[in-house]
């Protein structure tokens, strides 16, 4: 069975991502449930760092002037970190990666799209601050570049 896709409609155009429900069922399932519930509707990319990533998923970002943008999470709380040995997806350009607070099991609704290869964020490399990849942009990469 093919992995599901998600289409993001922005003021700069649309892009589509494949969601790795086959290898990242917890993280992908969390994202899909939030998307289907309408949680992500009307949100803005609240953190854009050129030559690094663009971040999305904070409920406070509906108002881009809200000082809390970037601090919110989903109504159900956080999810467990997912590090399956058969899913060593690297934080390559165009991949969707779960954001967290730097503590274990602190991911929830916020995720980012890598715009460069950020291998040091891969959960399977040594060091702190690990972010599991759960999808990749398959159409509209030019829109991601415009947002950046």
PLM feature segments, named:
Residues 1-148:
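Cyclophilin-like peptidyl-prolyl cis-trans isomerases
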């Amino acid at each position: 069975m093919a992995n599901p896709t998600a289409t993001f409609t922005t003021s700069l155009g649309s892009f589509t991502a494949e969601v790795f429900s086959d290898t990242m069922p917890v993280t992908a399932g969390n994202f899909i449930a939030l998307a289907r519930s309408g949680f992500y509707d009307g949100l803005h990319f609240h953190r854009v760092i050129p030559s690094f990533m663009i971040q999305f998923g904070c409920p406070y970002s509906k108002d881009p002037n809200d000082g809390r943008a970037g601090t919110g999470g989903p109504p159900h709380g956080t999810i467990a970190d997912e590090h399956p040995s058969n899913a060593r997806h690297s934080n390559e350009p165009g991949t969707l990666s779960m954001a967290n607070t730097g503590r274990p099991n602190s991911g929830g609704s916020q995720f980012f799209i890598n715009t460069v290869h950020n291998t040091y964020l891969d959960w399977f490399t040594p060091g702190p601050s690990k972010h599991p990849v759960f999808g990749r942009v398959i159409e509209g990469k030019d829109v991601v570049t415009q947002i950046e």
